[in-house]
Structures are given as C-alpha cells and as structure tokens.
Amino acid sequence: RYRNKAQYPVGSDGKFATIGFYASMTHRIIDCADCLLQPKEFAKITDIFRDWIRMKKISVYNESDGSGIIRHIYIRKAVVTGQIMVCIVANSDSVPHTEALIEQLEEIDGMTSIILNINREKTNVVLGKECKTLWGSNYITDELCGLKFNLSPLSFYQVNHDGAEILYNKAKE
C-alpha cells in the first residue's frame, strides 16, 4: 500500500454507479472495492461515495454526451502527517447533497480537506483549473526529506513517498 494518491473515474454500469479503474485499452470503468497499492482509507471513502451517489441519486458523468455531474474522485493521503484530502471532480460548479457526503467523510481519521474541482471540459484530463474548498483546509501537509509540503489537488507530488525519499537522498550524495 505504497501509493499516496488515487484518481478514480466515476460512471455507471447502466444500473449502479461504478467507481474504480478503466479496463485495459478502453474507457469502460471496472468497479473496484479496494486496491492493495493504496491506503485502506481509500476503499472506505469510495464506498461512502457509492452509497451517497445511489441514495441521493447524484448523476454520474457520461463521456459520450458530456452529461452528468460526478466525473472522478481524487484522494490523497500525506504519509508522514496522515492527513487526507478528498476532491470531487465535477462537471458543475455545485453538487447537490454535499452536506450528507461531508458528514460521513469527516468521520474518517485524518480527514483534513474536502474540495470540489470543476472540470466542464470534454476532455480526458482529470482535473479542471478551479477548486472550491467544501470543508476543512484547502491543502494537506506532508513531509519529504525533512521538508514540509502543502499539497493542493493541483500540486505535483510523487505517489510513492518512501521511494521518492530514497531517490532524493541518493541524488544528494
């Protein structure tokens, strides 16, 4: 479980919301309950999203016609501080029923930041340029090689914290 970031596409199998990963060489989303490369909290977060989308009847993005609201769920966890950021990537500048979602997400240990990212472009680029903080901080903080980094959804940061630290320390030698 070495990855500190995940970007899950959100779609529909025709009946239910699917949150997971693209099937090889396609844009068909395979629902994934857990990924052993990512922190355990990520599975709990995606479960909360699945239930929220179903219960509140939130529309999911349809790539072919550009309709629907929820496009991706983007999650980061700072390895050293344990802080977690959840970013809802939406095809709209507002999402209905976020209060119910936030109420559940804020109960997760380490939850620090819940952000809405707006991406109305008909593109396969995950994040749009605009972010709105829905709850908590607009960034999480992590440490790498003794330095502190404030990470927003738009920040670049190595997904393998420990591997990056080894490489950077080797480069310093």
Regions found by a protein language model. Name each.
Residues 1-173:
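Accessory RNA-recognition modules of RNA-modification enzymes
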